[in-house]
Amino acid sequence: MTYDTKVTALIMAGKRSGALDPLAERAGVAQKAVVPVNGVPMVARVADAIAACPEVATIRIIAHEPDEIAAQPGIAKLIEEGRLSFAPGKFNIVDSVFSGAEDADFPLLITTADNCLVTPEGYSEFIGKCLEAQAGGAAGLARKEDVQAADPEGQKRFYEFRDGGFSNCNMYWIGSAKALSAAEIMREGGQFVKFPRRIIKAFGLVNLIRFRFGTGSKEKLFEQVSKRFGFKLVPVELSDGHFAIDVDNERTFAVTEKILKRREGDRTSA
């Protein structure tokens, strides 16, 4: 099924206050978003993939230091074409999302600057499934077995539900201005596998118990959260486990670069 809806894409490219990311320090750059992976800055890879997705009209990068990002050739080209602009990063991820969403045309696709393995087809798959579900909000997930098949070192932690293990793909959907309140789920920083107590504040105690003991399905969890927010939130299962592997540290950097070299050849000396 095809849809005429055009999407605004937000790329979260902020940096943590007061600390230089270790990957950025090693690469000799000021922020993680411009660290090269197989010869191409991370944020440029993500922007290129999104720009090649036919469902996306405009792109906004939310950044604390936009000048270094804007100087990247691929980014500069998209700016010149009028497809890409910047919004200021804020103190936390939720307020940064609100900054990026200001005066934007909905629906919104939200992703991160380190999501280097998602293809244009992957973004299209996510957008299509969100539209088909008529979702007010959504999160992209990949099955544990698919992620491990992509690379066994790509992810170490998974959300365990009654219907299997899943990993977050750092793809989110905000269907309308009303649904923007769903971003509050991330107010404490997300990373619920690492910090389960955050689920109490975001989802409630009963859902924390279901999450910890794998007694509920992902659909049930999203259904309960939908009731809390007053609009439809859905889990979107994606077909490729690579989409759940992003660049968080040296291990996942090495995994991502290895996969990219396999896809496109070695570009580190280009």
Model-derived features with residue positions:
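Conserved active-site beta-strand element of glycosyltransferases/polysaccharide synthases
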Residues: V234-E237, D246
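Conserved core of the sugar-phosphate nucleotidyltransferase
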Residues: T119-S226, L238-H242
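Conserved N-terminal catalytic core of the sugar/cofactor nucleotidyltransferase
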Residues: T2-I11, V40-P107, T215-G216
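Short catalytic helix/loop segments, enriched in acidic residues and glycine
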Residues: R26-R45
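Short amphipathic alpha-helices within nucleic acid-binding modules
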Residues: F253-K258
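N-terminal nucleotide-binding beta1-loop-alpha1 segment
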Residues: M1-G28
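Short, conserved phosphate/pyrophosphate- and ester-handling motifs at nucleotide-, phospho-/glycolipid
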Residues: N249
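Short beta-strand-to-loop acidic/aromatic patch adjacent to the donor-nucleotide binding site
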Residues: F106-D114
